[in-house]
Amino acid sequence: MTDQRGPPPPHPQQANGYKKFPPHDNQYSGANNSQPNNHYNENLYSAREPHNNKQYQSKNGKYGTNKYNNRNNSQGNAQYYNNRFNNGYRLNNNDYNPAMLPGMQWPANYYAPQMYYIPQQMVPVASPPYTHQPLNTNPEPPSTPKTTKIEITTKTGERLNLKKFHEEKKASKGEEKNDGVEQKSKSGTPFEKEATPVLPANEAVKDTLTETSNEKSTSEAENTKRLFLEQVRLRKAAMERKKNGLISETEKKQETSNHDNTDTTKPNSVIESEPIKEAPKPTGEANEVVIDGKSGASVKTPQHVTGSVTKSVTFNEPENESSSQDVDELVKDDDTTEISDTTGGKTVNKSDDETINSVITTEENTVKETEPSTSDIEMPTVSQLLETLGKAQPISDIYEFAYPENVERPDIKYKKPSVKYTYGPTFLLQFKDKLKFRPDPAWVEAVSSKIVIPPHIARNKPKDSGRFGGDFRSPSMRGMDHTSSSRVSSKRRSKRMGDDRRSNRGYTSRKDREKAAEKAEEQAPKEEIAPLVPSANRWIPKSRVKKTEKKLAPDGKTELFDKEEVERKMKSLLNKLTLEMFDSISSEILDIANQSKWEDDGETLKIVIEQIFHKACDEPHWSSMYAQLCGKVVKDLDPNIKDKENEGKNGPKLVLHYLVARCHEEFEKGWADKLPAGEDGNPLEPEMMSDEYYIAAAAKRRGLGLVRFIGYLYCLNLLTGKMMFECFRRLMKDLNNDPSEETLESVIELLNTVGEQFEHDKFVTPQATLEGSVLLDNLFMLLQHIIDGGTISNRIKFKLIDVKELREIKHWNSAKKDAGPKTIQQIHQEEEQLRQKKNSQRSNSRFNNHNQSNSNRYSSNRRNMQNTQRDSFASTKTGSFRNNQRNARKVEEVSQAPRANMFDALMNNDGDSD
């Protein structure tokens, strides 16, 4: 596009003294289409006059001649960066069609819209149609045709000369001359259609060689085809005669000679075929192999053709007396084949394909007949293989064994230390084609007897969904929604819910199973079993034992129990004893204890006390309940019970005597001697979960339970203060001589149980009066010395510190004070008290928050008050009365008379002496 503008016309003068320039498309700021300039300066800063024949350039440019708008190195027209029209802000308009520029003009005082790229196909002008030029990766011109060559070779790779082959056949029959055969061999053959490769779509070639397909070539092709058909007929007739046993010796010799001639003359026969112009196909589509059958003929077609391509058709050599006419059997009949050479291509009708398929089938049958039968060769059986392997010498190390050269050794990576023989897949697969064995009936029977197929597998086998067993669904089924299929399956499942026999699991009814079990029992041989003879000393439940005699008391009504039965009944009743059933069960125990009134030695009473004592020591948590049981027995026991060995003590006093004597005996022995000890007599540290561990745990539990039981007996005044003084003195004696942890734990348990009550107890002797508080002061001094010594474990040390704080700080107010057995009513009462306490705390917190908000409301007024001296007013804060109340309580308790023992009437002065 050239610039056709001439020199600018002279500028007319305006009345106001300013020059008015004519409008140009590419001026600095002149308006287009002769529109008036509406700027404030009346276009004062318009374009400069031409200087040195260079338009739109100031005279003395600061940066030389190439300042802003000089486009010496640019294209065509001069355009400026501030032109708001005509492709604004761009220096060229090459991206737009010139015919489109006039339509892009905008009136004055309007900014041009943002311009976008418009494809050439969308340009609304009469421009040449846009055509996409395909990429041509082939450097050769597309008009040059590709020549395709086909090489026909035998099975051994030698080329087959069809030319000489036809000449020999024609010479033998005298039908045509050799010259005619040469011309026919150059023409197209029926193989050209199969051997023609499929050209890709981007390499479509125009048909430029249509002149070669004329009437002469067509006639030669027909003659060659006719020759092939004749050879096929002869070949078929010879095969039929051979099959029927009618072939003669002369024909055999003739076929043998023909076969030898064919083998000796096998030069290359190259058939050039013209490229076929076909419809474009996808380049990724693979070319199919034309011929591949048991006749041995195969055509190799490459996937991509870039130049002159040579294709080889390989024919297997005949294996029997038949000649090399196997090639001719690809065509069956001349009348069913039509060849069309129009537009340089060759077309074979559907009848040709059917003919070739039938001929290939016939050839397959022929080859099957001529090949030696493999069934005639005797193959070894699997049983023989197993027998041979059983006799063979085993290999000690398969990885070190010397294998033959053609055998690949097993891979060492499959070696396992726990398994002797481990082979990899590569080692085993190399014998796939080398070892062939046939299954013999004996092996089949032995293996099939070990295979069990559940009946439900065969019943649930899916039906044949297609002709070949595959899942051939119709297009409508393929597009079915997954939800619909799931609904159908759920409906089927719901229908099967009523009948479990059609479910996936093998279901048999109970009746069927019972019948099957009965049949199995009937079939099983019955063994004679000797009748069971009961032993004389067998165990019999007591409830089923029938007493031959029943002992009755002298009154004739009360039944007397023997020693074993008393122990059994006591254990049963003590196991059922709870605070809810305390009255009823304790009454039954008291009835058993009253049986001693018919005895002289109090044997039954001793058994009752012994069982209660063992139960109390073994269950320390329930010690308080068993102490209450002892108190009831002492209080309600029949006073007529006597013991001839303890004269002067009867009834309740006898019970206290038995109880105190049993507690004193066990307390003196302690529970350290029951721990497992070594050869030197020192206690051992048993292993966890061992027998010694459980023995030590039981001894510790019973020892601490004894101390706890003695403490609760003292709290119930069944034991006097003198007895408790003796217990503490014995413990303090042990504390002075390097105490053991067992002794310290006994002291801690006794203080937790009786500390509060013993603090205010006192014992009067003829010499002086002993107070419990004084004894406890001496005891805690010893404990403090042990704590400071640091020779004990941290567990015992912290327990001693807790007991010391319990007396000095908490004043025996322990949270564990009420820990013990409780009735259901007591548990409900405690829960109700706890709930009320929480509610009261919540209400108090709300009240305090309300008062705090009110106090904050008047805090500003209090801040403004004048500060006074702290000692100028008396504080209204009341002191804590906790210490005063505590001291007053101590004074009252000291002033009170000593508690009267509830069993003082029973023990009198003799109780302390015990």
Curated annotation (Swiss-Prot):
<feature type="region of interest" description="Interaction with PAB1">
    <location>
        <begin position="201"/>
        <end position="315"/>
    </location>
</feature>
<dbReference type="GO" id="GO:0006413">
    <property type="term" value="P:translational initiation"/>
</dbReference>
<keyword id="KW-0810">Translation regulation</keyword>
<keyword id="KW-0963">Cytoplasm</keyword>
<keyword id="KW-0694">RNA-binding</keyword>
<feature type="region of interest" description="Disordered">
    <location>
        <begin position="128"/>
        <end position="205"/>
    </location>
</feature>
<dbReference type="GO" id="GO:0016281">
    <property type="term" value="C:eukaryotic translation initiation factor 4F complex"/>
</dbReference>
<feature type="compositionally biased region" description="Polar residues">
    <location>
        <begin position="298"/>
        <end position="325"/>
    </location>
</feature>
<dbReference type="GO" id="GO:0031369">
    <property type="term" value="F:translation initiation factor binding"/>
</dbReference>
<feature type="modified residue" description="Phosphoserine">
    <location>
        <position position="503"/>
    </location>
</feature>
<keyword id="KW-0597">Phosphoprotein</keyword>
<dbReference type="GO" id="GO:0001671">
    <property type="term" value="F:ATPase activator activity"/>
</dbReference>
<dbReference type="InterPro" id="IPR036211">
    <property type="entry name" value="eIF4G_eIF4E-bd_sf"/>
</dbReference>
<keyword id="KW-0648">Protein biosynthesis</keyword>
<feature type="modified residue" description="Phosphoserine">
    <location>
        <position position="74"/>
    </location>
</feature>
<comment type="subunit">
    <text>Component of the eIF4F complex, which composition varies with external and internal environmental conditions. It is composed of at least eIF4A (TIF1/TIF2), eIF4E (TIF45) and eIF4G (TIF4631 or TIF4632). Interacts with PAT1 in a RNA-dependent manner.</text>
</comment>
<dbReference type="InterPro" id="IPR016024">
    <property type="entry name" value="ARM-type_fold"/>
</dbReference>
<dbReference type="GO" id="GO:0003729">
    <property type="term" value="F:mRNA binding"/>
</dbReference>
<dbReference type="GO" id="GO:0010494">
    <property type="term" value="C:cytoplasmic stress granule"/>
</dbReference>
<dbReference type="GO" id="GO:0000932">
    <property type="term" value="C:P-body"/>
</dbReference>
<feature type="compositionally biased region" description="Basic and acidic residues">
    <location>
        <begin position="496"/>
        <end position="529"/>
    </location>
</feature>
<dbReference type="GO" id="GO:0003743">
    <property type="term" value="F:translation initiation factor activity"/>
</dbReference>
<feature type="compositionally biased region" description="Low complexity">
    <location>
        <begin position="145"/>
        <end position="155"/>
    </location>
</feature>
<feature type="region of interest" description="Disordered">
    <location>
        <begin position="1"/>
        <end position="84"/>
    </location>
</feature>
<dbReference type="GO" id="GO:0042149">
    <property type="term" value="P:cellular response to glucose starvation"/>
</dbReference>
<dbReference type="GO" id="GO:1901195">
    <property type="term" value="P:positive regulation of formation of translation preinitiation complex"/>
</dbReference>
<feature type="region of interest" description="Disordered">
    <location>
        <begin position="457"/>
        <end position="535"/>
    </location>
</feature>
<feature type="compositionally biased region" description="Polar residues">
    <location>
        <begin position="339"/>
        <end position="348"/>
    </location>
</feature>
<feature type="compositionally biased region" description="Basic and acidic residues">
    <location>
        <begin position="240"/>
        <end position="263"/>
    </location>
</feature>
<feature type="region of interest" description="Disordered">
    <location>
        <begin position="833"/>
        <end position="914"/>
    </location>
</feature>
<feature type="compositionally biased region" description="Low complexity">
    <location>
        <begin position="59"/>
        <end position="73"/>
    </location>
</feature>
<feature type="domain" description="MIF4G">
    <location>
        <begin position="567"/>
        <end position="810"/>
    </location>
</feature>
<feature type="modified residue" description="Phosphothreonine">
    <location>
        <position position="301"/>
    </location>
</feature>
<feature type="compositionally biased region" description="Pro residues">
    <location>
        <begin position="1"/>
        <end position="12"/>
    </location>
</feature>
<feature type="modified residue" description="Phosphothreonine">
    <location>
        <position position="196"/>
    </location>
</feature>
<dbReference type="GO" id="GO:0006446">
    <property type="term" value="P:regulation of translational initiation"/>
</dbReference>
<protein>
    <recommendedName>
        <fullName>Eukaryotic initiation factor 4F subunit p130</fullName>
    </recommendedName>
</protein>
<dbReference type="InterPro" id="IPR003890">
    <property type="entry name" value="MIF4G-like_typ-3"/>
</dbReference>
<comment type="function">
    <text>Component of the eIF4F complex, which interacts with the mRNA cap structure and serves as an initial point of assembly for the translation apparatus. Stimulates translation by interaction with polyadenylate-binding protein PAB1, bringing the 5'- and 3'-ends of the mRNA in proximity. The formation of this circular mRNP structure appears to be critical for the synergistic effects of the cap and the poly(A) tail in facilitating translation initiation, recycling of ribosomes, and mRNA stability. TIF4632 is probably essential when TIF4631 is missing.</text>
</comment>
<dbReference type="GO" id="GO:0034063">
    <property type="term" value="P:stress granule assembly"/>
</dbReference>
<feature type="compositionally biased region" description="Basic and acidic residues">
    <location>
        <begin position="156"/>
        <end position="195"/>
    </location>
</feature>
<keyword id="KW-0396">Initiation factor</keyword>
